[in-house]
A protein has these predicted regions:
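Extended catalytic-interface subdomain
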Residues: 207-238
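Conserved redox-cofactor binding core of oxidoreductases
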Residues: 1-122, 128, 192-215
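Residues that flank catalytic or metal-binding motifs in active/ligand-binding sites
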Residues: 28-30, 108-111, 121-123, 170, ...
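Cofactor-binding catalytic cores of oxidoreductases
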Residues: 235-239, 250, 265
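Acidic/polar loop patches that form or flank catalytic/metal-binding clefts of enzymes
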Residues: 4, 59-61, 108, 164-168, ...
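Single conserved hydrophobic/aromatic residue that forms the stacking wall/gate
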Residues: 258-269
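Glycine-rich loop(s) and the adjacent beta-strand/alpha-helix scaffold that form part
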Residues: 10, 115, 124-216
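Short acidic, glycine-rich loop/turn motifs
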Residues: 127-133, 238-245
Length: 269
């Protein structure tokens, strides 16, 4: 199934966790490196966490452990290498090592159009390459569709799988009626609150052309500087009211820059 207990073993199998956390919720031998932000050059990061506690929100040492509620530093998919921390994507964890296999072909700059069906069984895919040419690829055993919350239902509907009301009006032959396809998407509403810093503690310190180049060089050679860490290194999961059983609001602390095109009043910190 898809319950928490059912999927937790797979998350643990994927993870290689570095740091202090609730061990029963983490994996330590997987290919995807995960560590809590250890950034030291963001003077406002820990101040944000302190302010959250002063506002009455608890501190949690592990968002992905026993207690999600609270404020803390985020965990990132980062791997500590001899040249410092490096972003560690799922491509680096899974795809790059597998590219050496003789039975794997990887195509880039293509768009999957639809599934090739044999009755109600998927036997391959049709895709369009960067030259605009339509190509076909067939599977010996199975096809795994993993194109995201928007891409997956779009491919299914173009293949004739989904709600007939959504499919047939576009002249697509219905293969299988499944009314949930493309429905029930849940997304976050985001509200940005920006503050004017009176001291040089934001990314403005690296905003000039020469400073941007220096930041990139420091990251590539030493794994340090503003380019070495995500701008969002801390946050919180909180309840919008005490009556809530579980946190229903997420806070992000972002060390960033904004461009103001219209007169705007910003609070100073």
């Amino acid at each position: 199934g898809w319950s928490y207990d059912d999927v937790l073993p797979y998350f643990k199998k994927a993870e290689n966790f570095h740091g202090d956390g609730d061990e029963e919720f983490h994996g330590y031998e997987g290919p995807l490196h995960v560590k809590k932000s250890d950034r030291t050059d963001d003077l406002l990061l820990d101040k944000f966490i302190e302010a959250g506690q002063e506002a009455g929100f608890p501190y949690t040492r592990d968002f992905n452990g026993k207690q999600q509620e609270g404020v803390s530093r985020y965990e990132h998919t980062i791997n500590d290498t001899p040249r410092g921390p490096r972003r560690w994507s799922s491509a680096q964890a899974y795809l790059h090592p597998a590219l050496e296999r003789e039975n794997l072909s990887n195509e880039i700059n293509v768009t999957v159009d639809k599934l090739i069906m044999d009755g109600k069984k998927v036997k391959g895919i049709e895709y369009i390459n960067k030259k605009g040419e339509r190509k076909s690829c067939f599977a010996n055993k199975e096809v795994i569709l993993s194109a995201g919350a928007l891409g997956s239902p779009l491919i299914l509907m173009r293949s004739g799988i989904g709600d007939p009301n959504d499919i047939t009006k576009h002249g697509i032959e219905l293969v299988h009626e499944l009314k949930g396809v493309g429905k029930n998407m849940q997304d976050h509403y985001g509200v940005t609150s920006s503050f004017y810093a009176t001291q040089p503690v934001t990314l403005h310190r690296s905003a000039s052309w020469i400073k941007t180049q220096i930041a990139g060089i420091k990251y590539l050679l030493f794994g340090t500087g503003d380019a070495a860490y995500p701008p969002c290194s801390g946050g919180g999961f909180i309840k919008s009211s005490p009556e809530k059983d579980l946190p229903d609001t997420q806070l992000h602390y972002v060390l960033s820059l904004i461009h103001i095109s219209e007169p705007t009043r910003l609070a100073s910190i």
